[in-house]
Design a protein with these regions (language model features):
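C-terminal functional module detector
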Residues: 2-189
C-alpha cells in the first residue's frame, strides 16, 4: 500500500502511504542502521495500527538474542521465548481502536537450500503456540507472553504474527471486505 495510486475516498482502492500498513525497523535514526535493520530482519509490519511496538527475545544457556539475531545453544536445550507487543489505546486512521485478539509463535526448521525452489512454503513451518488474553499479562498498553520451546535438536527460526480477528490463518480478502476489521501484524524470523 505504500505505492498509493488512487485513494479509496477518491474512487480508488488504495490507502495513503502509512495510513493502513506500516513497516517498523528497529534501528537508530541513521540511513545505515535502518538499512542494516532491514537486511538483518529487525522488522515488523502491521496493518491498521494493530500494534506499535514488538520485541522478541530468546534465551538459552545463559545467552540471549533479540529479533533479527541468532542464538547459539546446545542441541536438546530448552529455549525461552518472550514476546512483547504494544497494543496502543490510540485510534488509528479509521478512528477505531483495534485490540490484539491473538498472537501466534511460529517455528520452522532451517535445513539449507530448498530442494524445490518453486515451493512457496517451508513444509516444516508450524504454529508452536497460539496465545490469547487468557495466556498473556498486560503492563499498560504492553502485552507480554512467554513460551518454552523444549528440546530443540536442530537449527530453527521463529516468527511472530498476530491478529485482531478470529481467523486461524490469514486468508485472501473477499471483495468488499472492510480492511479495518481484518488486521494483522508479522515479524521477520
Amino acid at each position: 500500500t505504500s505505492d498509493s495510486h488512487r485513494h479509496y475516498t477518491e474512487g480508488g482502492s488504495d490507502f495513503w502511504p502509512g495510513e493502513y500498513s506500516k513497516t517498523y525497523v528497529k534501528a537508530v535514526p541513521s540511513h545505515a542502521d535502518i538499512l542494516d535493520g532491514l537486511r538483518h530482519g529487525r522488522v515488523f509490519v502491521t496493518t491498521g495500527d494493530l500494534i506499535s511496538e514488538l520485541d522478541v527475545v530468546v534465551q538459552a544457556g545463559g545467552r540471549r538474542a533479540e529479533i533479527g539475531e541468532a542464538l547459539q545453544f546446545a542441541r536438546g536445550s530448552d529455549v525461552l521465548v518472550t514476546i512483547r507487543v504494544r497494543d496502543p489505546d490510540a485510534a488509528n486512521a479509521a478512528g477505531r481502536t483495534p485490540q490484539v485478539a491473538r498472537i501466534d509463535l511460529i517455528i520452522g526448521d532451517v535445513t539449507g537450500p530448498a530442494a524445490d525452489r518453486e515451493a512457496a512454503a517451508n513444509p516444516t513451518t508450524r504454529v508452536a503456540r497460539r496465545f490469547t488474553a487468557e495466556d498473556w499479562r498486560r503492563n499498560g498498553e504492553d502485552i507480554i507472553v512467554t513460551h518454552t520451546l523444549s528440546g530443540l535438536t536442530g537449527d530453527a527460526y521463529i516468527r511472530v504474527r498476530g491478529t485482531g480477528g478470529t481467523e486461524l490463518e490469514p486468508s485472501p480478502d473477499p471483495a468488499g471486505e472492510d480492511p479495518w476489521s481484518d488486521l494483522w501484524f508479522y515479524a521477520n524470523p
